[in-house]
């Protein structure tokens, strides 16, 4: 009997905690919902949105495996867009994936400078919510784990410190 009461209590608490959760699906985020997330509302991701993210990611990997040039994955970014970073040769081996990780780490380090006052955390949460919802459209080719991490960070109150001048752009951090 105690277990049943505890389970019912846990379900009630979980339901109450998620009663005000905003479900993101990549299609219809309202200003009201976006500001609710900025103020601390938790988020959930609609399953169909994660399916789109997975399909998009699979498409990018298939293109890379077939020797297609993929911006930021098989070729550089910015002025290095014409520079081949790695060759998939029909297969994304552990070596190719490691080379891609090294490239991305190097890119992040080269962009890791910023200045100015720190952006209000609510505005950062707002930007994170909008970015997550955009990723859920399924057009970016991003790894599904990136979308999951955005949701986890929002739900756990993990908010990056973002200086207002010279910060890295969102397109530089999604692949």
Where are these regions (language model features)?
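Bacterial N-terminal signal peptides that target proteins for export
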Residues: 1-8
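A glycine-rich, hydrophobic loop/mini-helix early in the fold
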Residues: 13
């Amino acid at each position: 009997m105690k277990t049943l009461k505890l389970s019912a209590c846990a379900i009630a608490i979980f339901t109450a905690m998620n009663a005000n959760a905003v479900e993101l699906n990549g299609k219809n985020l309202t200003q009201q919902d976006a500001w609710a997330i900025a103020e601390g509302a938790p988020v959930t991701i609609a399953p169909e949105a994660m399916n789109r993210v997975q399909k998009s990611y699979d498409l990018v990997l298939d293109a890379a495996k077939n020797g297609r040039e993929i911006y930021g994955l098989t070729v550089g970014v910015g002025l290095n867009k014409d520079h081949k970073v790695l060759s998939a040769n029909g297969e994304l081996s552990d070596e190719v994936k490691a080379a891609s990780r090294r490239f991305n780490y190097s890119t992040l380090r080269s962009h890791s400078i910023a200045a100015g006052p720190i952006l209000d955390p609510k505005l950062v949460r707002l930007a994170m919510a909008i970015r997550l919802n955009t990723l859920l459209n399924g057009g970016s080719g991003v790894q599904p784990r990136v979308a999951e991490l955005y949701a986890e960070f929002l739900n756990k109150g993990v908010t990056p410190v973002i200086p207002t001048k010279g910060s890295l752009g969102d397109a530089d951090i999604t692949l």
